[in-house]
Amino acid sequence: MIEDMYEEKNPLGYFDNIRMDVISFIDKPAGEVLEIGCGAGGTLSYLKSNGLAQHVVGIDIASSQIEVALRQGVDEAFVSNLDDLEEILHGRTFDAILMLDVLEHLVDPWSVLKRISGFLRPGGRAYVSLPNVQSVRVLVPLLMGQWRYKELGILDKTHLRFFTKRTAVELLRGAGFELESVHHKLESHTLPRLINFLTLGVFKRYLTVQYILVGRI
């Protein structure tokens, strides 16, 4: 079962990240925040404890992580594969929804994101992160005839969909969002960042490992 595949990722630290890269773009406090794919709840707990959210709700497919999230101070947390999202949330709406490294794992991220938009209050924001399949990490091996799935990263073996910047933007707009901003998460190594600086960003799309998109309803 797919749930078991995610439970197996736990020893890799897959669920433990506090997404400071995304939090840095949350420019004002929100009342209620929902995170889909909340893992162990680190990001939600940080938002609440630092005054960026009053009430935080998490959803994840891995039951073991939901237990951790509740212990970390997440107000409400549910186990779900998103099929029963409407039943769980009972028509509730939120000021912000986080979907960080989630949509690429879904068979139909387009329809899911449209459903998610219905849980946002007017003026609410969605924060979405997606890996960049146009990264040099993928393109160089591909030119040599290699496409190897891995435990983590852009070619994570649980990824079902792949996006470039253009198709990521189309995904949000197609779901009814007004795109506020797109942020490039560059390779962490010094050399790619230096190349990007020296070339004035000409090769930025190839040196980006992930896009963070902010959309408003």
What are these regions (language model features)?
Residues 107-111, 138:
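Short N-terminal helix/helix-N-cap motif within the alpha/beta-hydrolase-1
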Residues 1-92, 96, 110-113, 130, ...:
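Conserved N-terminal segment of class I S-adenosyl-L-methionine
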Residues 96-102:
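A short beta-strand submotif of the Rossmann-like class I SAM-dependent methyltransferase core
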Residues 124-130:
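Conserved beta-strand signature within the Rossmann-like core of class I S-adenosyl-L-methionine
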